[in-house]
C-alpha cells in the first residue's frame, strides 16, 4: 500500500496536471470527437476512434487525480528534520565501491518521470529513514543486502 504523502511542490504539480487536463486538453479532445462524429460512419473513422480513446484516458486520469488530491497529506519542511533523513529530503549515498547516488524521497505520485526521485515506500527510502550523515543503511534487495553510507542530507526550504 502506498503512503499518502506528498511534498508541497508535488501537490502543486498534480493540481496543475489536473487543471491542464480538465480545462485545456479535455475540451480540445471533446471538440475533435464531436467533429469526427459529424463525419458519419464511426466504425471506420480513425480520428473518432483515437480521440474517443484519448478522452477515456483523460477522464480516467482526471478521476484518479481528483481522488488522489483529496487523500494526499502535504508534508512541509520542518527545521526539526535537519540532519536526519525524512520525507522530502535530498540524500546522497555511497557504497563501498565508491558508487554514489543522489535522490529525493517523495510520495508515490511524485516519482513518475523523475529518475532522481524515489518513493517513501521503497526499500531504499525505508532503510534511510532517520539516518544521519555517516550512518550505514542496509537495504534488502532481490540480490541480497546492499550497504550504503549517507554522505549528505538536504531539504528544500520554503
UniProtKB/Swiss-Prot annotation:
Keywords: DNA-binding, Transcription, Transcription regulation. GO terms for molecular function: DNA binding; RNA polymerase binding; transcription elongation factor activity. Necessary for efficient RNA polymerase transcription elongation past template-encoded arresting sites. The arresting sites in DNA have the property of trapping a certain fraction of elongating RNA polymerases that pass through, resulting in locked ternary complexes. Cleavage of the nascent transcript by cleavage factors such as GreA or GreB allows the resumption of elongation from the new 3'terminus. GreB releases sequences of up to 9 nucleotides in length. InterPro entries: GreA/GreB_C_sf (IPR036953), TF_GreA/GreB_CS (IPR018151), Tscrpt_elong_fac_GreA/B (IPR028624), Tscrpt_elong_fac_GreA/B_C (IPR001437), Tscrpt_elong_fac_GreA/B_fam (IPR023459), Tscrpt_elong_fac_GreA/B_N (IPR022691), Tscrpt_elong_fac_GreA/B_N_sf (IPR036805), Tscrpt_elong_fac_GreB (IPR006358). Belongs to the GreA/GreB family. GreB subfamily. It comes from Escherichia coli (strain K12). The keyword Transcription regulation applies. The keyword Transcription regulation applies. It comes from the Bacteria. Pfam families: GreA_GreB, GreA_GreB_N. GO terms for biological process: DNA-templated transcription elongation; DNA-templated transcription initiation; regulation of DNA-templated transcription elongation. HAMAP family: GreA_GreB, GreB. This is Transcription elongation factor GreB. Signal peptide: none annotated.
